[in-house]
Amino acid sequence: TLNQPKNDRFIRLRFRLFDDGLGFRYEFPEQKNLTYFVIKEEHSQFAMAGDHTAWWLPGDYDTQEYETVTSRLSEIRGKMKAAVTQNSSQTPIWEGGVQTALMMKSDDGLYINLHEAACIDYSTMHLNYDDKTMTFNSWLTPDARGDKGYLQAPCVSPWRTVIVSDKATDILASRLTLNLNEPCKIKDTSWIKPTKYIG
């Protein structure tokens, strides 16, 4: 629990640990001094232990239609301009911003995936890489006024997820994100069939 005695309010930081990673989120319980509020910023950080190889897409509010770039973390800023290719709807974020899910591999072979789960009535998260501190800072998609969300307690943020494995295929097979998402609200899913889309 994180207390703000000056404002007589608090939030909870909840962690869920799994064999292959963790999730954490912010919980805003109903309380006298916290009812309706605006998210101006989220300050979640992910500190890296090295200059990992990363597979990334440029951070963009409107599209994910970019080719995946492979580079060291320290090269993201330098490769960003070439990575932002023209398409019909794009709003790139900044030179160090990448989209989630972000996949990385350390020099000793550990795969690391940063993403989110249960993103319901909340802004999606991008990551801004700070070359000097080797830290990713969360960056939420804003509205036209720059606000990141309008909430009413009780409510929760999405889960921020970290999945790790010695094998890249284990990241894909992980059930961590599934287990953190809300249960399916569709009672009968028998009509849903897999398909291919090229667009």
Segment roles from a protein language model:
Residues 1-187:
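N-terminal accessory beta-strand-rich subdomains and adjacent acidic, glycine-rich linkers
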Residues 190:
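Catalytic cores of extracellular degradative/oxidative enzymes
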Residues 193-199:
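N-terminal small/glycine-rich loop or linker at the start of catalytic domains
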